[in-house]
Amino acid sequence: NLLQFNKMIKIMTKKNAFPFYTS
């Protein structure tokens, strides 16, 4: 699910795991 993936990315971004992923 793209929405679940987007949520996961946002959580990872908060943990600074993907600072280049701003979506």
From Swiss-Prot:
Contains 7 disulfide bonds. Expressed by the venom gland. It is found in: Secreted. Keywords: Calcium, Disulfide bond, Hydrolase, Lipid degradation, Lipid metabolism, Metal-binding, Myotoxin, Secreted, Toxin. GO terms for molecular function: metal ion binding; phospholipase A2 activity; toxin activity. It is an enzyme of class 3 (hydrolase). Its main location: secreted. One of its GO terms (cellular component) is extracellular region. One of its GO terms (biological process) is lipid catabolic process. The keyword Transferase does not apply. Its EC number is 3.1.1.4. Signal peptide: none annotated. The keyword Nucleotide-binding does not apply. Binds 1 Ca(2+) ion. It catalyses: a 1,2-diacyl-sn-glycero-3-phosphocholine + H2O = a 1-acyl-sn-glycero-3-phosphocholine + a fatty acid + H(+). Its cofactor is Ca(2+). Negative results: does not show neurotoxic activities. Snake venom phospholipase A2 (PLA2) that shows myotoxic activities. PLA2 catalyzes the calcium-dependent hydrolysis of the 2-acyl groups in 3-sn-phosphoglycerides. Belongs to the phospholipase A2 family. Group II subfamily. This is Basic phospholipase A2 Smb-N6. It comes from Sistrurus miliarius barbouri (Dusky pigmy rattlesnake).
